[in-house]
Amino acid sequence: ATKKEENVQDIAQTVNAVSGSTLDDYQIRDLSELAQVVSGVEFTKIDPRRATIIMRGQKLDPDGGNDQPIQGYIDEVPLRAQDVFSQMYDTERVEILKGSQGTLQGVVSTAGAIQIYTRSAQVGSGEKNGYVKTMWADNMTSMVEAASDLHLSDTLSLRVAGLRNTSDGNEIRNIRTHVNESHNFDSGRISLSWQPSDELSVRFKYQNSETDSIYPQPVAGSNGTPSYEQVVNGYVAEIALYESLGFAPAGSAAQLAYLNRPTYGDIPAGGLKASDGVALHFQNPRQNNSAEIHNLMIDYDMGSHALALRFSDSQNDAMGLIDRDYAGAYVYGYPQEVRTNTGIETFEMRISNQDSDKLEYTIGFFSRNSQTFTTADLDRSFSITEVAPQLYKPAVGFDYKTPNQACNAARAAPGSMAAKSWVLTC
């Protein structure tokens, strides 16, 4: 929190520090699971696209257009919420800093900051500090994590770490596209440490990661009374009448009948329950995040003062596709795709005195240059709106609902096989 080694009890601010061993003991893989060991902070992963953090009554919301009150970091690099919420591995510790943060943390954040520190290569030690860790659980969940140090010389060491995680989530089935829920995360990290003297330490880290999730949106309910087919039949007859009178384009009734009449013959007579985990839409909601992080850290002990320099460059490409037609009322669905490309470059310099126990001070400079480009594609394709815009809303107003959280909660009951892990160290 203060950018130097101190006892948490000696720091004049609210700090929760979670060690890597605690993360391993509780099998904590991402921020949404940190609530097991940290109080006063709420982590919520709404879906693969959105995640929020609430700290001291203020919320970090990636969809918000304003400056965020909570900033997340990995190895002192400020990142977007999607990157911070990615799965943690080979982690040294996590610090939760509550309250306004400024000079010492880089980006000004009014509610707090979250610092994730990964393990660095150890110089001057012959130990590999390596391990291979595997885990299996319900719903086709598997994880393989490995890391090890490679000692190149007495002053130069390299650490390599990687993770692969796959899961079928809550096993939601899309009976229209026959594509079921799946989540995949792959990441690799290289850490290079050079320590030519006791006074100078140089560390460089590169991380590449990709998250890919297909998450059908389950629905619950029935065809309603009247059924959707009866409603569409009525619209077809009405459009045919308008067409015969010249008030609608030729072929409108046929287009409506073809494009907007799913049979729903594959739905049980009693409808769908939340616990069924069934989706009906014709597109496959998908979230894909790919990120690269370059980070250079230089620390120099000048005797009475300590100099710290930080350079970072991070790139993120996020693609989100959703189908707004959850109930499958349109043959081609109602897809909406949003792609966001973000590049962030930062430079930070800090000079701290270390020659006085009575007066401590830090002089810092922080610069951030970020660019974000967002493109959105909203495609109704061949929909009813082309022939009868006024009928769009009532056409999907039957009794199917989209209690996504309720459906997922109903499917997320404790499984018969809890997570089983194996660890091999060297």
Can you say where each PLM-predicted feature lies in the sequence?
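Acidic, small-polar-rich N-terminal luminal/periplasmic segments of exported/outer-membrane proteins
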Residues: 1-123
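Outer-membrane beta-barrel pore domains and translocons
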Residues: 2, 58, 133-139, 163-165, ...
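Short, surface-exposed loop/turn motifs at beta-strand boundaries within globular domains
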Residues: 34-36, 46-48, 65, 141, ...
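Short acidic-glycine motifs
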Residues: 60, 107, 126, 159, ...
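Outer-membrane beta-barrel translocator/receptor signature
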Residues: 68-69, 89-92, 98, 103-173, ...
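Extracytoplasmic loops and strand-loop junctions of Gram-negative outer membrane beta-barrel proteins
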Residues: 96-97, 128-131, 171-176, 275-282, ...
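Signature of Gram-negative outer-membrane beta-barrel scaffolds
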Residues: 174-180, 204, 354-426
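Outer-membrane beta-barrel domain signature, strongest for Gram-negative TonB-dependent receptors
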Residues: 177, 183-362, 368-370, 404, ...
